[in-house]
């Protein structure tokens, strides 16, 4: 390792200084990137925020509701495990559909099913019914696997790809981060049923964004 370090010190690319200088000249401020991509980060980013809020909320509401109807920890574990297993089995099919038909073919069904599942939680008064809700949540999250990362990569401008995706991820994490305090606050001061219906309402807003405002970014430029 010492020899490799010495070699790396004495051997350098003749274009290294030029590339570093070029990157400094073409760098943009975050505010400039936001301004130039205000539709992608503002409008499409709102859809991203909502979808990740719904995705994270399922990890919070399902356990709380399970204990609310008197289920034991092992029953909750089975529900969560089956839901996650279904989620993972859909990774590859979701990617295939995105590349074959378009990004919205996975993101739109995903947010519709997520919203539907949250509307059904209040009626899940038994293990079997909550298991069914968990299955729907697993399917809905699975078919949307990678959709938002792919959408962000499609929308990212070539001259500021990294910073754009950094902002994109920040929006995504913000949606995920809001789920716990939102569900917890509504559940504590009002009711857990109202919390699930509130998430459903937010989901319906997200459906409008994904159906009408989020563009299809798949570009089929290859020859058949």
Predicted segments — roles?
Residues 40-47, 51-69, 75-77:
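Helix-loop boundary and gating motifs at the non-cytosolic
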Residues 12-45:
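Juxtamembrane intracellular "pre-TM" segments in multi-pass secondary transporters
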Residues 161-189:
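A late C-terminal transmembrane helix in Major Facilitator Superfamily
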Residues 143-156:
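Intracellular juxtamembrane helix-capping segments at the cytosolic ends
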Residues 105-120:
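Structural signature of the two symmetry-related core transmembrane helices
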Residues 90-102, 187-188:
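Helix-to-loop junctions at the C-terminal end of transmembrane segments
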Residues 1-20, 206-214:
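C-terminal membrane-cytosol helix-exit motif in multi-pass small-molecule transporters
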Residues 1, 185-203:
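A membrane-interface helix-boundary motif in multi-pass transporters
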């Amino acid at each position: 390792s010492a020899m490799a370090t010495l070699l790396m010190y004495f051997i350098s690319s003749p274009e290294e200084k030029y590339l570093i200088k070029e990157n400094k000249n073409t760098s943009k401020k975050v505010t400039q990137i936001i301004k130039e991509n205000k539709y992608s980060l503002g409008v499409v980013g709102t859809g991203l925020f909502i979808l990740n809020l719904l995705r994270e909320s399922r990890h919070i509401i399902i356990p709380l509701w399970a204990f609310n109807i008197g289920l034991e920890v092992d029953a909750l574990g089975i529900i969560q495990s089956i839901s996650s297993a279904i989620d993972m089995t859909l990774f590859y099919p979701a990617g295939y559909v995105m590349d074959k038909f378009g990004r919205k073919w996975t993101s739109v069904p995903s947010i519709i099913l997520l919203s539907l599942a949250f509307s059904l939680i209040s009626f899940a008064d038994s293990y079997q019914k909550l298991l069914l809700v968990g299955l729907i949540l697993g399917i809905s999250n699975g078919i949307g696997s990678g959709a938002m990362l792919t959408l962000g990569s499609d929308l990212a401008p070539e001259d500021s790809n990294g910073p754009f995706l950094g902002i994109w991820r920040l929006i995504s994490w913000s949606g995920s981060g809001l789920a716990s305090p939102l569900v917890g606050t509504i559940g504590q001061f009002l009711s857990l049923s109202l919390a699930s219906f509130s998430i459903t309402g937010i989901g319906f807003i997200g459906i409008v964004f994904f159906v009408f405002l989020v563009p299809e970014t798949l570009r089929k430029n290859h020859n058949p």
